[in-house]
Swiss-Prot record:
Gene Ontology, cellular component aspect: cell surface; cytoplasm; extracellular region; extracellular space; nucleus; plasma membrane
Protein name: Fibroblast growth factor 10
Gene3D superfamilies: 2.80.10.50
Family according to the record: Belongs to the heparin-binding growth factors family.
Top-level taxon: Eukaryota
Residues of this chain annotated as glycosylated in UniProt: N51, N196
Disease cited in the entry: Aplasia of lacrimal and salivary glands: A rare condition characterized by dry conjunctival mucosae, irritable eyes, epiphora (constant tearing), and xerostomia (dryness of the mouth), which increases risk of dental erosion, dental caries, periodontal disease, and oral infections. ALSG has variable expressivity, and affected individuals may have aplasia or hypoplasia of the lacrimal, parotid, submandibular, and sublingual glands and absence of the lacrimal puncta.
Taxonomy of the source species: Eukaryota, Metazoa, Chordata, Craniata, Vertebrata
A GO term for molecular function: heparin binding
Amino acid sequence: MWKWILTHCASAFPHLPGCCCCCFLLLFLVSSVPVTCQALGQDMVSPEATNSSSSSFSSPSSAGRHVRSYNHLQGDVRWRKLFSFTKYFLKIEKNGKVSGTKKENCPYSILEITSVEIGVVAVKAINSNYYLAMNKKGKLYGSKEFNNDCKLKERIEENGYNTYASFNWQHNGRQMYVALNGKGAPRRGQKTRRKNTSAHFLPMVVHS
């Protein structure tokens, strides 16, 4: 290409010396450099902007919001055992009594957790057919029929455990939580707080 430019320049201006042709060539090269650099600069900046945009979606604060609450679709069903921070499996016996057990193979601790709406679940003991329920006084009991006492708000806490609060009832504006004390006995909802470890449970998968 440069040979053609030199030849063309010499033929177009035969009366000019060779150094002038070289000057024309130099001016041509200088004028083409900014365009090339500008195009190259755009190519280099574009991927960086894309990566920056992508990283904003995976920021720690964004990830934290996603892992703090469940978004199960209505009708989602899971079989689990709820293992409390106090080292008890929550169970609902055939007479409807709610308590904790140390026995890993207790049939009354196998629970069916069903999402009734976003963030709200129903917990039912498979072998006793009782729903986990909390009345307006904060007492845990087993209910044969699904009612408003059986609706529980399921939440993931910072330590990775779940909490289950009454969906319909509060005490003095405070949430009331499902909880087992250090002896495996249920605690009254009025005495519970979200930060109390007695209200923290690990959902453990039940293998058939």
